[in-house]
A protein has these predicted regions:
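Short, conserved active-site loop motifs that form the nucleotide-linked donor/cofactor pocket
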Residues: 50, 91, 214
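Active-site-proximal C-terminal subdomain of hydrolase catalytic domains
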Residues: 56, 80, 95, 173-280
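Short glycine-rich His-centered loop
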Residues: 48-64
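Caspase-like (clan CD) cysteine peptidase catalytic core
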Residues: 49, 102-130, 134-193, 263
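Glycine- and acidic-residue-enriched helix-capping/strand-helix junction motifs
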Residues: 60-74, 78, 154, 228-232
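Caspase-like cysteine protease fold
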Residues: 3-4, 9-21, 32-34, 38-45, ...
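Functional beta-strand-loop-alpha-helix junction segments that form "active/interaction loops"
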Residues: 11, 16-39, 73, 77-123, ...
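Stable alpha-helical elements in mature extracytoplasmic
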Residues: 69-76, 100-107, 160, 164, ...
C-alpha cells in the first residue's frame, strides 16, 4: 500500500460531490378562471333599436348582502353588448348604493328614462336585475328591493312587480325581455330570512301577469330561493343564463335561440345544480310567445 506518514487519505465519506447551481423558478398559480367570463362571443352587431337596463345590488343598507350580484351585473353588461347587440350607450347601468328607489323610478316610471329613450315602435328592451326580491305579507305582492329599501316595509321602499309590468306595458315597443335573478320568498341566497319576523315558512307571493309583448325569465318559482353559486362566483341562475345566451341553450343547433330553448336549458341546469346543493330552484318563463327568437347568429 502506498500510504504516506501523517497524510490524510480520502474515504468514501469525504468525497465531495460538486455540481452547478440551478435556479428554481416558482410561477404564481393562475387565478380562478370562470368560463362564462372568458372569451364572451360577439354574436350580434350593435343595433340602435335595442336598449338595456341593468341593476345589480350586492350591498344593501338595511339587509344582508346578495353575494355576487354586482359581478353578475358587470358581466351581464358585456353579454348585453356582445351577445344581444345592445350598444353600450343604450344601457342604463347601476350597482350597489347607486341603485336606489329613486333610480328605479327614474328609469321605469311613466315619462322616465326608458319611456323617453326606448319607448318607440320597433325597439327592443332587455332588463336584468340581480338582488333581493321582497314580499309584502299583507297583500302577497312582490317587490324588487333597491339598495336603500327595507324588506320589512317593501310596499313603501320597494318597486312593485305589478307597477313595473304595468309601466312597461305602456311602452309601444316590439318586445321587452326581463331576466330576474331574485326571489320573493323573504329569504336570501344563503336561505336565511331577510324579514324581521323570521318566519320558518317562507312566503308565496302572487306574481302579476304580463302583456303579450313582455317575456319574463325568473330565477325561481313560488317560495323557492334564488341561490348563489360559490364555485362560479355568480348567482346560480345568472351563471347558467350567461352560458345559455352564449349558445349552449341552442338545443337544435340552428344558430337561433328561442325563449323556450333558453327556459328549457335554465330549468334543467339550474334545477340539477340546485339539487346537488340540497335545494330546489326551478326557473320559470312568463310569455305569450315562447317560440319567439331572442337572438340569432
Amino acid at each position: 500500500l502506498n500510504l504516506a506518514f501523517n497524510r490524510q487519505e480520502r474515504t468514501a465519506e469525504s468525497i465531495i460531490i460538486s455540481g452547478k447551481e440551478r435556479q428554481i423558478n416558482i410561477e404564481n398559480a393562475p387565478a380562478l378562471s370562470i368560463d362564462v367570463e372568458q372569451n364572451i362571443p360577439v354574436l350580434s352587431k350593435a343595433d340602435n333599436k335595442k336598449w338595456g337596463v341593468i341593476f345589480g345590488i350586492e350591498n344593501y343598507r338595511n339587509v344582508s348582502s346578495v353575494p355576487f350580484a354586482r359581478r353578475d351585473a358587470e358581466f351581464m353588461k358585456e353579454y348585453f353588448n356582445k351577445v344581444l347587440g345592445i350598444p353600450t350607450e343604450n344601457i342604463y347601468f347601476q350597482t350597489d348604493e347607486s341603485a336606489t328607489l329613486s333610480e328605479f323610478k327614474t328609469v321605469f316610471d311613466p315619462g322616465g328614462w326608458l319611456a323617453k329613450n326606448a319607448g318607440k315602435p320597433g325597439n327592443e328592451i332587455y332588463i336584468y336585475y340581480s338582488g333581493h326580491g321582497a314580499p309584502d305579507p299583507a297583500g302577497n305582492k312582490a317587490y324588487l328591493l333597491p339598495a336603500d329599501g327595507n324588506p320589512n316595509y317593501a310596499a313603501i321602499s320597494g318597486y312593485g312587480l305589478d307597477q313595473l309590468y304595468a309601466n312597461l306595458a305602456q311602452l309601444k315597443v316590439k318586445q321587452i325581455t326581463l331576466f330576474l335573478d331574485s326571489c320573493f320568498s323573504g329569504a336570501n341566497r344563503d336561505n336565511e330570512t331577510i324579514l324581521a319576523s323570521a318566519r320558518p315558512v317562507f312566503i308565496t307571493t302572487t306574481i302579476p301577469s304580463v302583456a303579450s309583448n313582455i317575456a319574463v325569465f325568473s330565477a325561481a318559482t313560488g317560495n323557492q330561493i334564488s341561490s348563489g353559486y360559490s364555485d362560479k362566483q355568480h348567482g346560480l341562475f345568472s351563471y347558467y343564463l350567461m352560458k345559455g345566451l352564449r349558445g349552449e341553450a341552442d338545443s337544435n343547433k340552428d344558430n337561433k335561440l328561442t325563449q323556450k330553448e333558453l327556459n328549457d336549458y335554465l330549468s334543467e341546469q339550474v334545477n340539477t345544480q340546485a339539487r346537488r346543493m340540497g335545494r330546489e330552484q326551478e326557473p320559470q318563463l312568463q310569455s305569450a310567445e315562447p317560440e319567439r327568437v331572442i337572438l340569432q347568429w
